[in-house]
Amino acid sequence: MKNLFCCILLFLGLQTAVVRAQTDVIGVYLTWQRDPTTTMTVNWVNLYPATPATVWYRDSREAEWKSATGTHHAAVPSSLQVRRVELTGLQPDTLHEFVLAEKPGPEAKGVRRFRTLPATLNRPLRFVAGGDMMHTREYVDTMNKRAAALEPDFAVLGGDLAYANGVDASRWIDWLQSWSLHARDKDGRCIPMIVGIGNHEVKGGTNYDIPAAAPYFYGFFALPENRSYYALDCGDYASFLVLDTNHTHPIPGDQTAWLAGAMASRRHKTFLFPVYHWPAYGTTKGPEGLLPCEHPRSIEIRTHWIPHFERHGVSAVFEHDHHNYKRTHPLRGHQRDEANGITYLGDGAWGVGTRSVPKDAWYLAHAEPRRHLFHVTLNPEGTIQVDAISGSGTVFDKVTLTKPRTTPVAP
């Protein structure tokens, strides 16, 4: 009888843990550690160390559920519990369903959905992009809803996500809740994210003590190559090079050497987008009497990174931090080049208060203090459509890039 009683208690404890895993989740978010055409990493955060790190999933066209179990750790210094399960061997461009912790019954409650990316670009691929996300919950909720309404394949988020400065777990709770609630399309499909680091992820803005300098960024996200600068390749057609503008890694040195090799090995990719936080061609924060592009960190980016962009060719560059809207003229060699210049898009105003913009910046084609996101369409024929969209849904600027990448130019 005593053994039976113990078994009942154990069963009830496990059942309670499973129920908690479903009902007390703070946030669910999808990322990639590798091939987005055949994998998906499911992450979720709650407060309970004992709940299982298990995901049940299936191709939405099939009846049978499979399970995968991953890892669990605390997002120190908080007590938030992070669970992470990488699903592999998935079919490209396919809708999948998943449930946390408990195998679904006939009713299949708590089901979420995601879609893998296509292996070959045989349809338009759409993503949203932006950064500097959450001064207030109202701001980030508005833009997350707008992003979901566009039904993108994924989101590219260029840093300053929760404005937690490496110390405030409560802001991450807000950010995770907002994304989980609102970054889902009308059919309940969750939008995966590609994330970069910004100064507000880091204690002091710049700090090379990894991961302690940015414990929540490194705790919440399993990054390709296990660092804040990395490449993510989408099938045979696109690559994103996510960089760290001197937040937890310096710009020159190892990161620049890695960038040179990463770009050289991706010459065959149709589309290639660098993504980073601090802008080379900004809209504010200029030294006294000078344009923003003359800030020392902007000069450092132009000195070490942009020569590689120009040498190998890119599709466009995403920059952030300055809390405005920006689209530059096509630029090459630090001057306008309408024939073969690079367009820089920014400046990080997803969900923040905006700032004034310079009226006489020679490199700016369009700049204004407006919260926005970019809606980007990669077309199979090689063109790129970029729409700038406000929280109310207004398309207030747009550009069509007629070449998939700028033509490489030898130094």
Question: Where are each of the predicted segments found?
Answer:
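Positively charged n-region of N-terminal signal peptides that target proteins for export
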Residues: 1-4
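Bacterial N-terminal signal peptides
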Residues: 6-15
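Intrinsic disorder/low-complexity segments in short proteins, especially the signal peptide
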Residues: 14-17, 95
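Boundary at the C-terminal end of the N-terminal hydrophobic targeting segment
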Residues: 19-23
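Metal-dependent phosphoester/phosphodiester hydrolase catalytic core
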Residues: 24-357, 364-370, 375-410
